[in-house]
């Protein structure tokens, strides 16, 4: 993650000034750059390592050649080179102790800042997911409400249609029964005026038959 400067100090912790405060590359360097910076700060340490390796190589070659005097001399050089390397490391550690302590503090602060940023991003992502879930739930609830309203409307229409059909059937039945009642009334209201005379003639005929016998 690129940064433009040192991370902000933690609350209640005011760091001491350091030579790295204005060095932006210090916070953006990789492993190779860090090693190069260490070599530039303490050049005597790699020099002592090179001298130690050279003395050990010379002792090995003298041993292969059978020159015991040179072997002893090279081993003494190796011991001296190792002592020089250790001394350079100790002196560099003492000289750069404050900067190293500051470097560790800055590294811890940067690590804490990165962890805090990751935590905030994680919280924001959870909040965004929560909002998405709430929005999806609201949309589903609205869809269910619309579906329920549409179903209720369809049921209401079906009930109204059934009621209208029942009313029409009742009106048709009432009309049919009214027509039958008017048709069964005698006289001018729709009945047959000759029916009583026919009944009377039938009765008269029946009465005249015994007298003929």
From Swiss-Prot:
- Offer one example of a GO biological process linked to this entry: mitochondrial respirasome assembly
Among its keywords, does the record have Coiled coil? Answer: yes
Q: Provide the HIG1 domain boundaries.
A: 16-107
Q: Where along the chain is composition biased (Pro residues)?
A: 1-14
- In residue numbers, the region (Disordered) covers 1-23, 142-213
GO CC, sorted alphabetically, is:
mitochondrial membrane
Q: Which compartments does it reside in?
A: Mitochondrion membrane
Coiled-coil spans are 100-149
Q: Name one Pfam family in it.
A: HIG_1_N
Transmembrane region(s):
44-63, 75-97
Gene3D superfamilies per record: 6.10.140.1320
| Residue ranges with Basic and acidic residues bias | 152-164
Annotated membrane topology is: Multi-pass membrane protein
Composition skew (Low complexity), residue ranges = 165-175
InterPro entries given in the database record:
Hypoxia_induced_domain, RCF1
Q: Which UniProt keywords apply?
A: Coiled coil, Membrane, Mitochondrion, Transmembrane, Transmembrane helix
Q: What is its main location?
A: mitochondrion
Q: What does this protein do?
A: Cytochrome c oxidase subunit which plays a role in assembly of respiratory supercomplexes.
Q: Oligomeric state and partners?
A: Associates with the respiratory chain complex III/complex IV supercomplex.
Task: Identify its protein family.
Answer: Belongs to the RCF1 family.
Q: What is this protein called?
A: Respiratory supercomplex factor 1, mitochondrial
**Top-down, what is the taxonomic lineage of the species of origin?**
Eukaryota, Fungi, Dikarya, Ascomycota, Pezizomycotina
